[in-house]
Amino acid sequence: MKIRKAEKKDIPRILALLGQVLQIHAEIRPDIFIPGTTKYTPCELAELLEQEDHPIYVAVDEDDLCMGYAFCQLREQPFSTNMVPFKSLFIDDLCVDKQTRGQHIGESLFEYVKQQAKELGCYEVTLNVWAGNTSAEHFYEKMGMKTKERQM
């Protein structure tokens, strides 16, 4: 397995994985998520691949098939009267194909994102988890993440 930046050839597999994530969210929150859809269209995903401040990393197998991804956003907090300026790398979405879970691909992707954040001069890596997504909560806690804010 290797991890690299996503390319246009990865779009079909990324869309399939986005569908897996959306299904989980639709089961947790059927009042707002629509099963059988994805967060992005192929065109939107192609545009996203061009944005330097929205890197998408993919874990690929020996045949260069995408087994998982991490959608990220580089965020900058400018100086204000109450906060020092800093950069963070926000994980907008992380998924490993349900057929390849349990092979430490998610851990590898997460560690890769942390390394990229360090190389980009980021102060921290952040993310959101939907309430009820206990497997994601446990995964991120295992990776050392701690809750620092709750939205209600």
Report each predicted region and the residues it spans.
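A short beta-loop-alpha structural element at the N-terminal edge
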Residues: 2-17
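Conserved GNAT-fold acetyl-CoA-binding loop/helix
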Residues: 23-45
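A short helix-loop-beta-strand connector motif used in the catalytic cores of GNAT acetyltransferases and
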Residues: 43-58
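Conserved beta-strand in the GNAT
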Residues: 58, 65-74, 95
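Glycine-rich acyl-CoA binding loop
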Residues: 59, 102-110, 117
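A short, internal acetyl-CoA/4′-phosphopantetheine-binding micro-motif in the GNAT/acyltransferase core
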Residues: 60, 76, 92-101
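Conserved active-site alpha-helix within GNAT-family acetyltransferase domains
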Residues: 107, 111, 119, 131-149
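Conserved GNAT acetyl-CoA-binding A-motif
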Residues: 118-128
